[in-house]
């Protein structure tokens, strides 16, 4: 498997997590929508499924990891940033085969692609604190 396949899976997973957070729709429905309506060329579909389902089912546990390091209430964190941080927290916690530097770098790149101008700095700082705590 090429690293770019995982990168594309992360990108799709962040979009699905974002959609799920905002819509409140059933996890299976959101996953089905993304798997049938998005281009899956070069996407590690199994990894996408794991990331999306993992974040959705372990949201509370993941939030508890980074909430102590927030500089504001979680309700004030943008939905895009929450989706990215939850995905990275999942990889850092449950995917020991993914080096922490890779998980953080991928999250920063996602924040640059989808977040506001300074999102990548927020995501980087928060994940650095999360890793330092481990």
Swiss-Prot record:
Instruction: Please tell me whether the keyword 4Fe-4S is annotated for this protein.
Output: no
Q: Where is the signal peptide?
A: none
Q: Which UniProt keywords apply?
A: RNA-binding, Transcription, Transcription antitermination, Transcription regulation
Tell me the InterPro entries matching this sequence. NusB-like_sf, NusB_fam, NusB_RsmB_TIM44
Respond yes or no to whether keyword Cytoplasm is given for this record. Answer: no
| GO annotation, cellular component aspect | cytosol
GO BP terms: DNA-templated transcription termination; transcription antitermination
Matching entries from Pfam families are given as:
NusB (PF01029)
GO MF terms held by the record: RNA binding
Tell me the function of this protein. Involved in transcription antitermination. Required for transcription of ribosomal RNA (rRNA) genes. Binds specifically to the boxA antiterminator sequence of the ribosomal RNA (rrn) operons.
* Protein family membership: Belongs to the NusB family.
Q: HAMAP family from the entry?
A: NusB (MF_00073)
Q: Identify this protein by name.
A: Transcription antitermination protein NusB
* Gene name linked to the record: nusB
């Amino acid at each position: 498997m090429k690293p770019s396949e995982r990168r594309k899976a992360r990108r799709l997973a962040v979009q699905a997590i974002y959609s799920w957070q905002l819509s409140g729709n059933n996890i299976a429905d959101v996953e089905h929508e993304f798997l049938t309506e998005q281009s899956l060329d070069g996407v590690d579909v199994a990894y996408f499924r794991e990331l999306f389902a993992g974040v959705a089912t372990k949201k509370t546990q993941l939030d508890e990891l980074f909430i102590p390091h927030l500089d504001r209430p979680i309700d004030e964190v943008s939905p895009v940033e929450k989706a990215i941080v939850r995905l990275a927290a999942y990889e850092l916690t449950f995917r020991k085969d993914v080096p922490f530097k890779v998980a953080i770098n991928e999250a920063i790149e996602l924040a640059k692609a989808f977040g506001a101008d300074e999102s990548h700095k927020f995501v980087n700082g928060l994940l650095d604190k999360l890793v330092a705590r481990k």
